[in-house]
Each structure stands twice: as structure tokens, then as C-alpha cells.
Swiss-Prot record:
Keywords: Periplasm, Phosphate transport, Signal, Transport. It holds the Pfam family PBP_like_2. This is Phosphate-binding protein PstS. It comes from Xylella fastidiosa (strain 9a5c). It comes from the Bacteria. Phosphate binds at A58, S59, F60, S87, D105, S188, G189, T190. Part of the ABC transporter complex PstSACB involved in phosphate import. The gene is pstS. Residues 1-18 form the signal peptide.
């Protein structure tokens, strides 16, 4: 089965992209940054030597990284090779210094960063959404509370017409069908944010399963990457899984509404992700170590997540590290439209300034 997003067609097992000559999504957008930080038209590939940048990690951010990479290549001639292997793989590869940047939806704490000689900074904000394969259930129509979602993944609720689900969905016809669980099989920041949220809303989940990039699932089938989970949910009737919103929308999957910490039923969207992120205190988060699941706010999506970029503080190739940072600087300044189109939340200007100050102090 194929998985579609962002104008790319991928087989579920295809997890890497090398951008070499794709056209930008908007021919009129600003496409470069001058030495004083202002956006300008960049030199052509013929005027400057092409640079190859390698990255690996979270599938959560893959649709956006892919689009940014295509546009950056068209603007500068530089090539980005990003492998969608899961946050755990990205962390392992950047620690081993086999790539220029790693990507994780789970922030590392300062002690782990120091031990590994790494720095980290946010790249974008998105949301994890439960997705289901149920006939005649349109996207956003099925409602689940956090405790209900935990009980489903714990295996305590095993039928779609369970009284607890029906109680949250008056008037919605739910079948007498077994619930089939789909989860990640690889080390995953998406899993971290999903399990972190469930640990906040269910004491039983916290005690029995807990949180992490990999957990001991009570049952179900595992898929590799957001791509793999999306594929399995599409194939298995009565299934439920969790993916980043872009995967659900581009594959026309049915996602659920969730009840947030304020008791409101909310739909996943860039707006509800932004509402969840609006009170995030990044200035007091050392090394940007902040998780924003189960945020307060009437309109907040409860499983909102941040993607983080990991880079080595010490390097033998300062020019390569600068080229990598230039890619993210360009993306922050020129990639907001792409982020919005793919239902991510671009970073606010004040946070970008904090990140650039962090670069100056940590990546010397």
C-alpha cells in the first residue's frame, strides 16, 4: 500500500529522500539570507559549490523536512539527504557522528546532551492524532477522552461498541467490531509524545506502560515509522493507531476528536496545535527541553509535539556545520508557508531569535 503526502509518493518501506532538483512550492517566495540576516535571492548553484547535508530521525517531521529540502535545493543547489528512520535512530546516528543532524520528537535533557557533546533546538510544532479504520466514520466525528484512549491501548476496551465509547459518542453508530491496535515498532518520538500524554491522563497507563520512545505495548501490531502505522491502519479493519496529522490528511484517514485538559472537544489542526504551544515557556527551558502535551487552553490539542534538531557541538568540519545551520536558518525564514500548508506550526519569531542566540553560544 502506498502512503501519500506533500506531493511525494512513497512506499511504506521507503524511508529516505535525497533532494537534488525539485522545484520550489512557490516560485515567488524569498529564497535566501544575506550576511546581515535579510532575505535575498541566493547565488545560483553555478556561483557557489554545492553542499551535501545528511540528516536522519523522526518520521513526524519528514513531510516538512522534505518540502524544505526541495525548496532549499532549488534556491541554492545544496542537497539534503534526510532518512526517516524514527527519533531513536536519529539520536543514535548523531551520537555516532555519522550524519550532520539528527531529528527527534523527544527532547534530550541537558545531562544527556552534555555527555554526548550535542546541542538541540526546535524545528517546528505539530500534532499526534489517533486514526481509525471504521466504515462510515468521517474524520473528526469519533470522540475519545484521554482515559478512553488509554484504556483502548491497554486492551481494557476491546470492542468499538463498548458502553464507554458509546457514552462519549451519542448518536454515532459504532460497530460490534474488535479493536485492533497499531503502534510503532521502532524508537519513536511520536510514541514518546503519545505515551507521555497517556501517562498524564491515566494513572494505570503510567504505572503499567509509562512513557518513552519505545514502550512495552500490551498488544497490537507494530509499524515502522508514521508511514508504517498509517499503512497498517489503512489495511486492518477496526484498527486504531497514531500518526502525525500530515500523514492522516494526505492519506485521507479518519482521525478522532479528543477532549482536552479544559474539558473541550477539539479537532486536530495547525490552529489547535498553536493554541497548545501558545503558553510554552521556551526562555526558561534549558537546551529547549520542553514537552507540551496536555496543555491548558480552551482550544489546545492535547497531543501537540515539538520536533527537535540535534547537532554536535564539536566538529572537524566547521564549514559543514555552518552549511547545516544555514539550511535551518533559511527554512525558518522562508519555510513558514510550507509549514502551514502541511499543517505544522512554524516557530514564532521570538523563538527563532532564541535559537539563533543558542547557535552562537553552543556551536562555536
Amino acid at each position: 500500500m502506498k502512503v501519500y503526502f506533500a506531493g511525494f509518493t512513497l512506499l511504506c518501506l521507503c524511508t529516505a529522500v535525497t533532494i537534488t532538483g525539485c522545484k520550489p512550492s512557490n516560485d515567488n517566495q524569498s529564497t535566501g539570507v544575506s550576511q546581515d540576516g535579510n532575505s535575498t535571492t541566493p547565488p545560483s548553484a553555478e556561483q557557489t559549490k554545492s553542499v551535501k547535508i545528511s540528516g536522519a530521525g523522526a518520521s513526524f517531521i519528514y513531510p516538512l523536512i522534505s518540502q524544505w529540502s526541495a525548496d532549499y535545493n532549488a534556491a541554492t543547489g545544496n542537497k539534503i539527504n534526510y532518512q526517516s528512520i524514527g527519533s531513536g535512530g536519529g539520536i543514535a546516528q548523531i551520537k555516532a557522528a555519522t550524519i550532520d543532524f539528527g531529528s527527534s520528537d523527544k527532547p534530550l535533557d541537558s545531562s544527556e546532551l552534555t555527555q554526548a557533546g550535542l546541542g538541540q533546538f526546535p524545528s517546528a510544532i505539530g500534532g499526534v492524532v489517533p486514526v481509525v479504520n471504521l466504515d462510515n466514520i468521517e474524520p473528526g466525528k469519533l470522540r475519545l477522552t484521554g482515559p478512553l484512549l488509554a484504556d483502548i491501548f491497554l486492551g481494557k476496551i476491546s470492542k468499538w461498541n463498548d458502553a464507554a465509547i458509546i457514552s462519549a459518542n451519542p448518536g454515532l453508530h459504532l460497530p460490534d467490531t474488535k479493536i485492533n491496535i497499531v503502534h510503532r515498532s521502532d524508537g519513536s518520538g511520536t510514541t514518546f509524545n503519545f505515551s507521555n500524554y497517556l501517562s498524564k491522563v491515566s494513572a494505570e497507563w503510567k504505572q503499567k506502560v509509562g512513557e518513552g520512545t519505545s514502550v512495552q505495548w500490551p498488544g497490537g501490531v507494530g509499524g515502522k515509522g508514521n508511514e508504517g502505522v498509517a499503512s497498517y491502519v489503512q489495511q486492518i479493519k477496526g484498527s486504531i493507531g497514531y500518526v502525525e496529522l500530515a500523514y492522516a490528511l494526505q492519506n485521507k484517514m479518519s482521525y478522532t476528536a479528543l477532549q482536552n485538559a479544559a474539558g473541550q472537544w477539539v479537532q486536530p489542526s495547525a490552529e489547535s496545535f498553536a493554541a497548545a504551544a501558545s503558553n510554552a515557556d521556551w526562555s526558561n527551558a534549558k537546551d529547549f527541553n520542553l514537552v507540551i502535551t496536555n496543555a491548558t487552553g480552551e482550544a489546545a490539542w492535547p497531543i501537540t509535539a515539538t520536533n527537535f534538531i540535534l547537532m554536535r557541538k564539536q566538529t572537524k568540519d566547521a564549514a559543514q556545520r555552518k552549511a547545516t545551520l544555514d539550511f535551518f536558518k533559511w527554512s525558518f525564514e522562508n519555510g513558514q508557508k510550507q509549514a502551514n500548508e502541511l499543517h505544522y506550526v512554524p516557530l514564532p519569531p521570538n523563538l527563532v531569535k532564541q535559537i539563533e542566540a543558542y547557535w552562537a553560544s553552543e556551536f562555536k
